[in-house]
UniProtKB/Swiss-Prot annotation:
The modification N6-(pyridoxal phosphate)lysine is found at K224. Signal peptide: none annotated. Its EC number is 2.6.1.9. It is an enzyme of class 2 (transferase). This is Histidinol-phosphate aminotransferase 1. Its cofactor is pyridoxal 5'-phosphate. One of its GO terms (biological process) is L-histidine biosynthetic process. Gene3D superfamilies: Aspartate Aminotransferase, domain 1, Type I PLP-dependent aspartate aminotransferase-like (Major domain). It holds the Pfam family Aminotran_1_2. Pathway: Amino-acid biosynthesis; L-histidine biosynthesis; L-histidine from 5-phospho-alpha-D-ribose 1-diphosphate: step 7/9.
Amino acid sequence: MNLALKSPAPRSGILDIAAYVPGKEHAPGVAKVHKLSSNETPLGASPRAIEAFQKAAFNLERYPDGQANALKEAIAAVHGLNPANILCGNGSDELLGLLCHTYLGPGDEGIVTEHGFLVYKIQITASGGTPVTVKERQERVDVDAILAAVTERTKIVFIANPANPTGTYIPVEEVRRLHAGLPAGVLLVLDAAYAEYVRRNDYEAGLELVSSNRNVVMTRTFSKIYGLAGLRIGWMYAPRDVVEALDRVRGPFNLNAAAIAAGAAAIRDQAFVAAAVDQNHTWLAKIGQALTDIGLRVTPSVTNFVLIHFPEEAGMSASDADAYLTSRGFILRAVGAYGFPNALRMTIGSEEANKGVVAALTEFMGRK
């Protein structure tokens, strides 16, 4: 006991964590704003999900199902899974945190990649562990670099596939090679938040690896293609012993009733999902080509966003472009915290928003 303290002190390391900062939402003084900073779908939620959400309003006095069984069963039906291997959470962020708090402690290490989702480092550190950052290769996860970083202290490895903010992915054979090189006691976490958008024959979100191994989990979200970011719904497919371990430490009612109902309705409406995939696929190609045509480098993406790189010239930097776009009502995401100080991430939005950004950046680049 330290009687000299004048107020409660956080655990060592907590105040060293840089708080997560979401994408900005406002453009002061602009009448119409197009928010393209958080990878939200321009199509909104399925009408079926909205209807289910509205119906849930008539039972607000009742606690939700603590196991979210209706949602688990809907997920299982769509993906052909066993509901017993599914755990739902208040966004996949909660599940990532639960994994760290369950499998990491002081002296343990968690491996992340240099441009990986910032929440990985936050949760590793918050759990008392030490994040170990490995280099990527050409803005892609480098399997060899990860395997070279594994030590006897490594307990967990995080990869986002596809990755955010690059939009790149690694083929399933590379994921298998990564898993094969890890000790059995190391947990491989495959964050597949953008899996629904991928149209590549050599991609697999993680269902196969989880089904055949005891040290792999896959996390998914309803915040992107399903348009339910405001409800915070995530899910995890994992070996039964991992699900049981996390069930011991998660909150007893971690997913609200409206989220359960809307999520179940959304995932069953696969026609709506297919329309969203088609819309994104069309505009992803158009945006990439249009930005390349005006002299910008765009990282090839398989997701619903693109990473745009700007010239290393005075007045032409990403921060200059960000200010220029914001003044015209287009909000993109600065990604300096992800190791890209001279790039912006753009969500694929509505036709109006997409064309508007291209027009604004054409004007911006024409000032050289």
